[in-house]
Amino acid sequence: MPKSCAARQCCNRYSSRRKQLTFHRFPFSRPELLREWVLNIGRADFKPKQHTVICSEHFRPECFSAFGNRKNLKHNAVPTVFAFQNPTEVCPEVGAGGDSSGRNMDTTLEELQPPTPEGPVQQVLPDREAMEATEAAGLPASPLGLKRPLPGQPSDHSYALSDLDTLKKKLFLTLKENKRLRKRLKAQRLLLRRTCGRLRAYREGQPGPRARRPAQGS
């Protein structure tokens, strides 16, 4: 069955076929970052599975890498953009999954009611840089005491390729330099071939030793 976004009150699904809409899995290989994702989702006792996803509408533009055709999250990206109709409302636990079946169970009476005249309340949570600055000042970043994840940890998600841009640029520069050196080598070989041809022609055209003519008497 098609998957849907695990964020509360978000109806985006794989089957929507919307352009510029991508889905991203939870960073299970980085527990601290995973805790931030789950906390920002706003669902009580929510436990994502390996195939649970969240759509790209819940990330700020700076969370994505500008290189490539597909939207790739940066290694420290955190979902912070949510539109909750009631910020104090927390949905009950729907099980350990974030797929479409759990999504149907997560629908509450409040979600089925029409929005208020004022419209949904746009809630933007503090981004990761602000939380890191708070930690540097000696203050707790969140009630759970989140810490900054250690750099260099392996990850199986798209945002783990934080150095993808740098690696591709280095590859392009290397290929360009290789092409230049090949042209230079080709020119050197051509020059060497011409020089050898001239030397061979010179040797073939050089006259051999001749006998001395006898001296004529007076």
Swiss-Prot record:
A zinc finger (THAP-type) spans 1-82. The modification Phosphoserine is found at S100. GO terms for molecular function: DNA binding; zinc ion binding. Transmembrane segments: none annotated. GO terms for biological process: positive regulation of transcription by RNA polymerase II. The keyword 4Fe-4S does not apply. Residues 97-120, 133-154 are annotated as: Disordered. InterPro entries: THAP3, THAP_Znf. A motif (HCFC1-binding motif (HBM)) lies at residues 156-159. SUPFAM superfamilies: Glucocorticoid receptor-like (DNA-binding domain). Highest levels in heart, liver and kidney. Lower levels in brain and lung. Keywords: DNA-binding, Metal-binding, Phosphoprotein, Zinc, Zinc-finger. SMART domains: DM3, THAP. The keyword Transferase does not apply. Component of a THAP1/THAP3-HCFC1-OGT complex that is required for the regulation of the transcriptional activity of RRM1. Component of a THAP1/THAP3-HCFC1-OGT complex that contains at least, either THAP1 or THAP3, HCFC1 and OGT. Interacts directly with OGT and HCFC1 (via its HBM). This is THAP domain-containing protein 3. It comes from Mus musculus (Mouse). The lineage of its organism: Eukaryota, Metazoa, Chordata, Craniata, Vertebrata.
